[in-house]
Regions:
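Conserved small/polar residues in nucleotide/adenosyl-binding loops
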Residues: 174-177
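Flexible, solvent-exposed coil segments and beta strand-coil junctions
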Residues: 109-110
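Primarily recognizes Gram-negative and organellar outer-membrane beta-barrels
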Residues: 12, 17-19, 23
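Amphipathic alpha-helical protein-interaction segments enriched in hydrophobic
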Residues: 152-162
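Short, well-structured active-site flanking segments
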Residues: 94-106
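Acidic, glycine-rich segments characteristic of secretory precursors and extracytoplasmic regions
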Residues: 1-14, 57, 123
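Conserved, well-structured interaction surfaces
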Residues: 21-97, 113-127, 132-151
Length: 177
């Protein structure tokens, strides 16, 4: 019997006898929570920072592309979408952990911990998120709407809506009793 679920491969659940012994949701229930077994927190943390890193890596790679398949218009769109995602991931970090680090570029894998940015204030995080959303909207790469196969991609209206959500979360921090 499998001890852990493999995301995207749930065929084993069709078996008559299936026992799931250590799922993330049982972390507290069975006392598995420890510094080495963080459950949901660990997964959220790594997903956020991997997403930010990949966005900056993509932006670096995009600067080096020069061929007929990737037009300047497409580059502008991709840059705007990656800035939108950088803002989105920083917002997820702020929502999950409060004031957090602001990552402004690719961090080399050999960087010692002392070389990482320190935790920023909530005001700095909110300002950075809104700065990235403004960059995404000002570059002209985000259209107002998408249709067809592009439906669901980042738009100018989504960036404005996300900006309002960022201000809402920041406002709640200051106005809560």
């Amino acid at each position: 019997l499998p001890a852990n679920r493999t995301f995207g491969n749930s065929y084993w659940l069709a078996e008559e006898l299936t026992a799931v012994t250590k799922e993330l949701f049982t972390t507290f229930k069975y006392g598995y929570y420890s510094p080495v077994s963080l459950g949901f927190t660990s997964n959220t943390w790594s997903t956020i920072w991997n997403g930010i890193h990949q966005c900056y890596m993509f932006q670096e790679s995009l600067k080096q592309v020069s061929n007929e398949y990737v037009t300047d218009e497409m580059k502008k769109q991709y840059l705007a979408e990656s800035n939108f995602l950088i803002a989105y991931y920083h917002f997820l970090s702020m929502r999950s952990y409060g004031p957090t680090m602001i990552i402004r570029s690719v961090i080399d894998l050999e960087t010692p911990i002392s070389g990482f940015p320190e935790r920023s204030s909530i005001d700095e995080v909110v300002a950075f998120i809104n700065e990235k959303l403004d960059e995404a909207m000002s570059e002209g790469g985000l259209p107002t709407t998408w249709s067809g196969k592009d439906y669901g991609r980042a738009t100018r209206l989504a960036a404005l809506a996300w900006k309002s959500r960022v201000y809402l979360y920041a406002c709640l921090l200051y106005t809560s009793p």
